[in-house]
Amino acid sequence: MSEHFFCSSLSNIKSSDWNECVGNDHPFLQYEFLYALEKSNSANTKTGWQPYHYIEQENDKIISLCPLYIKNHSFGEYIFDHSWADAYHRYGINYYPKLQSAIPFTPVTGDRIVLNKSVKDKKGKQVQVINNIIQEAKKINVSSLHFNF
């Protein structure tokens, strides 16, 4: 039986567990890179990149993950959605905070929903992860959910 949760810091996760799921194909998804952003205070609440990573475990093994950040602005995304924020504001709706899956400060492409190679039903697991993240987005009352690059 698997369980999922959201974590506000990678310091709560073992680097070997994270990297086993990620593999070697995406260096910007590696634990060391993302955690360095946290440790250097580049990705935190003050900079508008509050980590809120999705992690699913089964038998103490990470079987899926998604790097997520609670964003209070659109800086450092390489997506220019300021007009969206302005439109929300004109209609009296808050655009921020939003929940975003991205690699901070870089437009690098790659997987955002990462599945352990042991997962058999890849499509089914991706749908489950997305549904879990959507439920959490509603629960924490963010305006929207974004997946970049």
Show the residue positions of the predicted features.
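N-acyltransferase acceptor-side catalytic subdomain
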Residues: 1-149
